[in-house]
């Protein structure tokens, strides 16, 4: 930490992706994360990260950026036709009504029953260059280009946007996810199933209420 506003880190950890992925599994509203999260999240990776946090005239601002290897946990070999790619990720969050009680913007239910409305709106953009896995940091390895195949080196752009509102026990949460690519997402190998990058869009919405007696 440089001061109360700046922080840098190096190693393997969660990327600054969609909020539901970053929230701990013990602090979710429901028993499991959504299908949208499972398909489009950017999970963990190895690299550098930087954080900036500040409050300006009562409005909270959180900025995060990361440069990572793009292969996720337990990365596969970096040699061969798919070597050399990196993942570049940035996230911004604005809290127009100020900070949540007890860091409540990163647990889903309003268990602390906010006395005034609290809102956090965030967006992440991530570019994964020369992906090796079907979901970037997750999934099985893609087949590599060869002289006898039409397989391409695949790079993707992922947009993740979310919003969390809490007030007096009520918690409303929504997410939008999109992943696209200019490359052919399908890779092939003789006599085995195709492997392809998951592209497309997804939306999730959820709500909960914590009674005062809880």
Per-segment meaning from a language model:
Residues 93-214:
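Detector for outer-membrane/organellar transmembrane beta-barrel domains
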Residues 1-73, 79-99, 117-120, 125-127, ...:
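Outer membrane beta-barrel
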């Amino acid at each position: 930490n440089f001061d109360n506003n700046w922080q840098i880190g190096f190693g393997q950890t969660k990327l600054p992706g969609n909020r539901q992925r970053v929230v701990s599994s013990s602090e979710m509203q429901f028993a499991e994360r959504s299908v949208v999260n499972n398909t489009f999240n950017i999970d963990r990776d190895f690299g550098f990260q930087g954080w900036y946090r500040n409050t300006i005239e009562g409005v909270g601002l959180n900025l995060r950026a990361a440069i990572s290897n793009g292969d996720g946990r337990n990365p596969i070999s970096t040699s061969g036709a798919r070597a050399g790619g990196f993942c570049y990720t940035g996230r911004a969050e604005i809290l127009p009504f100020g900070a949540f009680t007890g860091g409540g913007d990163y647990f889903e239910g309003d268990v602390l029953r906010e006395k005034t409305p609290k809102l956090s709106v965030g967006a992440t953009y991530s570019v994964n260059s020369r992906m090796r896995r079907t979901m970037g940091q997750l999934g099985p390895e893609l087949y590599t280009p060869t002289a006898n195949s039409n397989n391409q080196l695949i790079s993707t752009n992922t947009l993740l946007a979310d919003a969390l509102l809490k007030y007096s026990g009520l918690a409303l949460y929504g997410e939008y996810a999109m992943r696209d690519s200019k490359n052919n997402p399908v890779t092939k190998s003789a006599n085995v199933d195709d492997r392809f990058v998951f592209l497309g869009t997804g939306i999730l919405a959820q709500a909960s209420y914590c009674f005062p007696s809880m």
